[in-house]
């Protein structure tokens, strides 16, 4: 590929407004960084096709630095993939999308400030993003205050669509209780009845811990103990060394760099040899596998997305998505990792928004209520927009339910053990919207 072609690709991938700072370039190759800088001055080649059509402004807040940076960067790739594909195919309602990116630095206070800037200064029409659950929780009231639609794209904390729900926020993928009810029967029925949980000690880890305690008990098992480990802990040994006793399996709830840390250190301490080893699939995301090596062998996890072309995922639409994602991920990681669930859910979140905007004839902020009504009950059919599978965005709480994949790592690769249909993951709504 020529330098000119590379620049064009990155021009399309990074068409957003803002200054190019050193922080924005962290994690990109020098060639890609150069191309990124160029796009601040040169519009994407397809932009001219829209003439004078006013672009929709979509804000996306992601952790591009700090504890969540590794996942935040792949999440951003998913957003960009969808936006570029939409713009190349004629936009939404004949208008292009302009993407405005904010780095929340993996900090709730920074995230809230950045979201307020997106809404007040950048004047975005809608927002798609949110990675760390504590940041999602901090920002949700802001979207409600300014009456702007917020499509959550990674955060899994249970309360986002239950006790802390609001009319302006939607989650078009799974959440902690759905994963737990899908996985607990396998854990108890095929691996062991007594479990010990180690978890990331913040909103997501805590709500996921609670969900598994409940569902393992319902399945006939027992959680005999749990230990929280602060987010970003580089040396987990002082915590892991406290884990001992008579139980069958160790269950981990971690992601990103912390997933690599516990995978390696639990192995080194002999915990994954002494006990069955299972957990949230984020521990063994495709982007983590190289750093885990053979220490993750035999791990059993659950995830909404696994990058394999087998069974129900052996479809033309999934192959197209996976191949496209590998090309885009290679631009930030030369090893060309397979896509993770963050790429998938962000890609599909943008596409869900597109459907809602088309259905409502959305023009801008003045049509926010029309957009909300279009998104409530939105049916998303498996295909190029939604390669993960069918889903419906429930009207009562803005929560979707999707099929889940139980998998293990065999010879360094993903192997699907069970596919749990979305119908088996459904919980009754537990949300009361405040009148707007």
Walk through the language-model features, giving the residues of each.
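Segments of small-molecule ligand-sensing domains
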Residues: 328-343, 354-416, 436
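Venus flytrap/periplasmic-binding-protein-like
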Residues: 104, 151, 158, 231, ...
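C-terminal segment of N-terminal export signals and the immediately downstream linker at the start
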Residues: 40-67
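Extracellular/periplasmic periplasmic-binding protein-like sensory domains
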Residues: 266-347, 360-362, 420-435
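Beta-alpha junction/loop-to-helix N-cap segments that form part of ligand/metal-binding clefts
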Residues: 53, 70-77, 90-162, 172, ...
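Extracellular/periplasmic Venus flytrap/periplasmic-binding protein
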Residues: 113, 158-159, 166-269, 312-320
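N-terminal secretory signal peptides
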Residues: 1-24, 33-39
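Periplasmic-binding protein-like
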Residues: 118, 122-131, 151-153, 196-199, ...
């Amino acid at each position: 590929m020529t330098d000119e072609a590379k620049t064009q690709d990155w021009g399309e991938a990074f068409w957003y407004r803002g200054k190019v700072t050193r922080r924005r370039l962290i994690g990109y190759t020098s060639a890609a960084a150069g191309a990124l800088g160029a796009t601040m001055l040169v519009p994407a080649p397809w932009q001219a096709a829209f003439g004078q059509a006013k672009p929709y402004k979509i804000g996306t807040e992601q952790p591009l630095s700090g504890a969540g940076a590794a996942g935040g960067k792949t999440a951003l790739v998913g957003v960009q993939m969808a936006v570029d594909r939409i713009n190349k195919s004629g936009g939404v309602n004949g208008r292009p999308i302009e993407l405005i990116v904010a780095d929340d630095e993996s900090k709730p206070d920074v995230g809230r400030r950045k979201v307020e800037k997106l809404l007040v200064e950048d004047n975005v029409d809608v927002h798609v993003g949110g990675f760390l659950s504590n940041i999602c929780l901090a920002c949700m009231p802001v979207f409600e205050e300014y009456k702007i639609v917020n499509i959550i794209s990674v955060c899994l904390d249970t309360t986002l669509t239950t006790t802390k729900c609001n009319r302006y926020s939607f989650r078009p993928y799974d959440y902690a209780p759905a994963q737990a009810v899908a996985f607990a029967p396998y854990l108890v029925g095929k691996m062991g009845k007594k479990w010990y949980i180690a978890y990331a000690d913040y909103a997501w880890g805590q709500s996921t811990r609670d969900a598994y305690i409940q569902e393992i008990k319902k399945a006939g098992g027992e959680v005999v103990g749990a230990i929280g480990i602060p987010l970003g802990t580089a040396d987990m040994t002082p915590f892991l060394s406290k884990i001992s006793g008579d139980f069958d399996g160790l269950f981990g709830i971690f992601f990103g760099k912390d997933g690599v840390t516990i995978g390696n250190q639990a192995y080194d301490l002999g915990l994954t040899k002494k006990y069955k080893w299972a957990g949230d699939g984020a521990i063994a995301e495709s982007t983590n596998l190289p750093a885990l090596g053979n220490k993750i062998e035999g791990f059993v996890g659950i995830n909404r997305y696994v990058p394999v072309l087998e069974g129900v995922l052996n479809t033309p639409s999934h192959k197209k998505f996976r191949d496209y994602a590998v090309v885009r991920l290679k631009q930030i990681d030369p090893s060309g990792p397979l896509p993770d669930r963050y790429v998938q859910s962000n890609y599909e979140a943008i596409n869900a928004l597109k459907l809602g905007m088309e259905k409502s004839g959305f023009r801008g902020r003045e049509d926010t209520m029309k957009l909300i009504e279009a998104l409530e009950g939105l049916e998303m059919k498996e295909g190029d927009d939604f390669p993960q599978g069918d889903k419906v965005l429930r009207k009562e709480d803005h929560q979707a339910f999707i099929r889940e994949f139980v998998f293990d790592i065999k010879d360094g690769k993903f192997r699907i053990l069970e596919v749990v249909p979305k119908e088996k993951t459904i919980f009754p709504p537990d949300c009361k919207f405040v009148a707007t």
